[in-house]
Amino acid sequence: MKQVTGFAPASVGNVACGFDVLGFALTEPGDEVTVSFTDDENSPAQVIISKIIGDGGALPTDPYKNTASIVVIKFLEFLKTHKGIEQSGTFSIELKKNLPLSSGMGSSASSAAAALIAANSLLGSPCTKMELVPFVMEGERIACGSIHADNAAPAMLGNFILTRSYDPLDLIPISTPPELYCSLVHPHIEVPTSHARSILKKEIALSSAVRQWGNVGALVAGLLRCDYELIGRALEDVVAEPVRAPLIPGFYDVKHAALDAGALGGSIAGSGPSIFAFSDSLAKAETIAKAMQETFRKVSNLESDIWFCPVSREGSRIL
């Protein structure tokens, strides 16, 4: 039997103004997936889930309904069809969930990316990380009913990733400014991604679209120029944040607390309920995270978990 353990970090999709087209990875926390392979030339390849730790029994063990396993199934099918690599035997998956569910932290993408990087390594790395991203996106379909790359791509690749197009898929990595840090607070409530997506408007005013486009362009420019002040100005969302904010008790109070503590800017992480904020030093990031946590406690009587760390430049990796 051979086995490999993969890790993939939490990620933040949308990044305020970049709904479904922009995301970044954190250095922590992240999910761990161990993939074990037992060869059996008399048996066709099968994928099973042997153990899930840390989910409180919430995740399915059916390999076709769990993001960590379905992506490995799709990956093996791809290898057989497109690369002439066919396996026989059993791939057993053990998932250690370190990310909260329905948190806006890219939990499903983290599990999928960790499983894929482990399975790919186990088979001699026949695919590049970039080639693995579409499989992570298939995991997102299982998790929330739609394919999107704003968590899937950074969880696998690290850094900021801009999705220029979905058909064909065109991913553009953006290097992270050296002194950019993220504070993340996760209140102890759940906001299912499917619900957070369902309440969004299907059409928006042209004036809102123009403002959003301007902010996306400015954010990308700020990242490329390492212009921290511009990054902060660009963290404005006129499309999703106003609709989703009511799902998070005390959201605007927490956001203002982050700004008062020195944040460059911030918004809802993905579909929520987590909230992120950027700063230009680790010390500030810690202060901001604690301020957001305390505000949730005072304003909404909600306990929360916090993290403060750099943006991950690596994404998924083998442990």
UniProtKB/Swiss-Prot annotation:
BP term (GO), one: threonine biosynthetic process
Which residues make up the binding site for ATP? 100-110
The molecular function terms of the Gene Ontology recorded here are: ATP binding; homoserine kinase activity
Q: What class of enzyme is it?
A: transferase
Q: Which UniProt keywords apply?
A: Amino-acid biosynthesis, ATP-binding, Cytoplasm, Kinase, Nucleotide-binding, Threonine biosynthesis, Transferase
Keyword DNA-binding tagged: no
Give the pathway listed in the UniProt entry for this protein.
Amino-acid biosynthesis; L-threonine biosynthesis; L-threonine from L-aspartate: step 4/5
Q: Which InterPro entries match?
A: GHMP_kinase_C_dom, GHMP_kinase_C_sf, GHMP_kinase_N_dom, GHMP_knse_ATP-bd_CS, Homoserine_kinase, Ribosomal_Su5_D2-typ_SF, Ribsml_uS5_D2-typ_fold_subgr
Q: What is its EC number?
A: 2.7.1.39
The protein in question is named Homoserine kinase
Q: Which organism is it from?
A: Chloroherpeton thalassium (strain ATCC 35110 / GB-78)
What phylogenetic lineage does the species belong to?
Bacteria, Pseudomonadati, Chlorobiota, Chlorobiia, Chlorobiales
What gene is it encoded by?
A: thrB
